[in-house]
Amino acid sequence: MTVDFVQQSPSATEDPFEFYWNQQGEWVEEPNQRRGGESGVQRIHDGEGRLLYAKRQVGHTYRSWRYPLGRPTVLREQDALLALSALSVGVPELVYCGAQQATDKQWRALLVTVGLEGFVEIDNWYAAGERERCGEAVHDRVLEAIGHTLARMHLGRWQHGCLYAKHVFVRVTGQGEGAEVDVALLDLEKSRQRLTAQKAASHDLKQLRRHSSWSATEWDRLIYFYKTVFGSAIKGLR
């Protein structure tokens, strides 16, 4: 059994799964054992020299009422990447996703995305002194961009599921009034749609509050911007 999403095939005659599976590069996340299988991430490059990230999995599945026998987790991540992109939520560009099940029912699965050029984790952005370099007006716009991004995701009833500060990436280009701020979300492996936007929002925002270093004042500012798009308050965020 084979499942494929291909944005760019290496060639008309080459099997894209085997092409990307056989590419080797530096391990960003060493293969680890979980969910009854193995998962790791490598940096590779395509024929044009673009930096790509390849998530490789063997027997790494999740179960749900729709998939009681198990489904590769990269397929759930693919669903989230495509859905969030359609909601104008910044996420890595999907190049290839595929899963193959052998006769012994063991899955091999692969997710390939384009590297986020110029983006850094929000905590690393602070640690590098970018807030001081850019000034408070730009910092306010960073909080605004994060709040708006999360609100768009939640209005689509999508829950990130693992929303820590390390999964929020920012890019600031230019300075002063001309500065542009972009936000991207990573690690969507646990993402899923909830029955309501409120449920998605409540889970993610409480999780982010616990796993971020923003002060109470900064958090209140982020939530203020969030509500300008989401349209209503989320209980229990303080």
For each predicted feature, which ranges?
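Conserved ATP-binding subdomain of kinase catalytic cores across diverse folds
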Residues: E18-I122, A151, L155
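Short glycine/proline- and charge-enriched loop/turn segments
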Residues: G59-S64, A128-R133, D187, A200-K206
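Alpha-helix N-cap and loop-to-helix initiation/capping positions
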Residues: L69-P72, V138, A200
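Conserved kinase catalytic-core helix
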Residues: A80-A83, L87-G90, F119-G161, A165-K166
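C-lobe/activation-segment region of protein kinase-like
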Residues: E177-R238
